[in-house]
Regions:
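Active-site neighborhood of HAD-like aspartate-dependent phosphohydrolases
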Residues: 17-64
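Short alpha-helical
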Residues: 40, 69-72, 114, 135-136
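Helix-loop "lid/cap" segments that line or gate small-molecule binding pockets
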Residues: 48-49, 69-83, 140
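Metal-dependent phosphoesterase signature
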Residues: 75-114, 122
Length: 140
């Protein structure tokens, strides 16, 4: 096998495939792309559900509920969703808990920090987008 094989913007070498993009700016999603946040989201979700007398959700259920922001997560997790009379209180409890516990188990995926540092060291601009509420993204 050849030492280096290229395919569009990827190179395969002894270490595996390496992406060889050359953009000025790179934009990444936060949850589930750069950071593994599922554990803290599930813990805060279950804290809020428990505090309001609702059944807790498994990690797999929360994984399926994630997407389109934390309000949508809680809409899916709370029995009856937005129609539940305790929705707003439960959602507020979730937000309050998450603000204090969003770094309990959250961590970057393997290789993320090295990739970001590599981009920065090459003078590239890096941005993060998230549909998570602003205050929660700042600590992360």
């Amino acid at each position: 096998m050849e030492k280096n094989v290229t395919c569009d913007s990827m190179t395969r070498n002894d270490k595996g495939w390496e992406v060889q993009f050359n953009y000025d700016t790179y934009v990444f999603d936060l949850d589930g792309t750069l950071l593994s946040t599922l554990g803290d989201l599930a813990a805060s979700c279950n804290h809020a559900l428990r505090a309001n007398g609702m059944p807790e959700r498994t990690i797999d259920e929360v994984r399926r509920f994630v997407g389109n922001g934390v309000k949508k997560l809680m809409e899916r997790a709370i029995p009856g969703g937005l129609d539940n009379p305790l929705f707003e209180k439960t959602f507020a409890d979730f937000r309050q808990h998450y603000m204090h516990h969003n770094l309990d188990t959250t961590c970057p995926y393997p290789g993320v920090m090295e990739m970001l540092e590599s981009l920065r060291s090459r003078g590239k601009k890096v941005a993060v987008v998230s549909n998570k509420f602003y205050a929660a993204t700042q600590a992360l």
